[in-house]
A protein has these predicted regions:
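Domain-level signature for proteins that mediate thiol-based redox and metal-cofactor handling
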Residues: 1-176
Length: 176
């Protein structure tokens, strides 16, 4: 029985690995760090834990719906989707593979490190002012000669930048 349950959890992770972020479809919710945990609850239900990139993220209902559809399509039995806000999501949770996919898609990945490693409780994170980070490199030509045009880009978690060298605009995934 335990081996079957473990295989179901493995299968759930595999299935959910393919669920794309609805706002940036080239990366999965797992690669972005939104998919936090998949576990078996005491009542036998599969429990999927997700964390929004910020507390007001409008894509969370779509993400939950997509997770549900993926689990149903894989016939993984009864499930529950839980949203947790603690610890708060951080761009540190974005995988290296996702950063490369973002760059190839034309979105500059976040620069620097926010210091909130996966699983670190919010109370364990030092409180500090956000340092001025270097300008992001252009995802089109690689130049570091970029300028911010607007604090918000195509979504609230991105800023709009332009490359001074190739003149192309691009979104920058803000670090937080």
């Amino acid at each position: 029985m335990q081996a079957t349950a473990d295989r179901a959890l493995e299968r759930a992770w595999e299935v959910l690995e393919a669920v794309p972020d609805p706002e940036i479809p080239v990366v999965s919710i797992r690669e972005l760090g939104i998919l936090r945990e998949v576990r078996r609850a005491e009542d036998g239900h599969l429990e999927v834990v997700i964390t929004p990139t910020y507390s007001g993220c409008p894509a969370m209902s779509q993400i939950a719906e997509d997770v549900g559809h993926a689990l149903e399509a894989a016939a993984l039995g009864p499930y529950r989707i839980a949203t947790t806000l603690t610890p708060a999501w951080t761009t540190d949770w974005i995988t290296d593979e996702a950063r490369e996919k973002l760059r190839a898609y034309g979105i500059a990945p976040p620069t620097g490190n926010c210091g909130g490693g996966a699983g670190q409780a919010a109370s364990e994170q030092p409180i500090a002012f956000i340092p001025k980070l270097p300008a992001p490199a252009c995802p089109h030509c690689g130049s570091k000669h970029t300028e911010r045009l607007a604090q918000f880009g195509s979504t609230a978690c991105k800023a709009l930048y332009r490359c001074i060298d190739c003149r192309e605009p691009f979104d920058y995934f803000k670090p937080y």
